[in-house]
Amino acid sequence: MNIATLIRYKKGTYDSIWNGNSWFAHGNIVDIARHYGVGLTVIATDGDYEKVCQMCDGLIIPGSPINIDPSFYGQEPFDPRNEVEEYLLDSKVIAAFDKMGKPMFGICGGIQALNVFYGGTLERVSNLKTDALAENPSSHIEEEQRVDRYGNTVEYHTHPINIKKDSFVFDVFQSERARTNTYHGYALDRIASGFDVVARSDDGIVEAFECREKKIYGTQWHPELAYRLNDPLELKFFENFFRVCKENAR
């Protein structure tokens, strides 16, 4: 089985030939693919996504440091505009996988890309730790220090979510209540037609949706951090998604 994912852009300083702006594949997703013995193909340019779609069984749309420009969902654009518009490639890749009826899983910015592609909108939210605490000292977001599998200390921001039964999120947590990480400044506003909201935070922010007919799933948080933090529970999101991709390919 082979899964596709998208390259992401990171702006850096030009201290040497090895530094500066760079393109990267999300390391946690690479590690998870290795963990399950799944092939992973990274889509980097407009020139190869259709061919990759044909050879892959599903698509993981990762999060990104870059927010989708509001002009893509009918609102005033950023000022200044993004240096790089990743959504231009994201939307083409989503269209190709949609046309071929292949499963997709969007994570953080990935769920936002799916929502915008299928006709939904986004809104700015104060859901980052610093923003939330500045506006509300009793914020539902908690911070803890976690040590990852590489010995690094991670600032882990979490909050509670409410989960709909008979959903892909409930399939993992087996509960209507769970704590997940949270690292986003935008959230889903109007939900794209055909998608069911299956998890919300206590303040009403959409945390997950799905379209079972199209086999499309999305989380506003980062379940891929589970591998880095040695948490086997949320790895089941990927295990279950890979199973859906395998069954769909038959």
Residue positions per predicted region:
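Conserved beta-strand termini and adjacent loop/short-helix elements that scaffold enzyme active sites
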Residues: 43-45, 125, 183, 200
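Conserved beta-loop-beta connector loops within the AMP-binding
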Residues: 168-175
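Active-site-proximal beta-strand elements of phosphoester/diester hydrolases
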Residues: 217-221
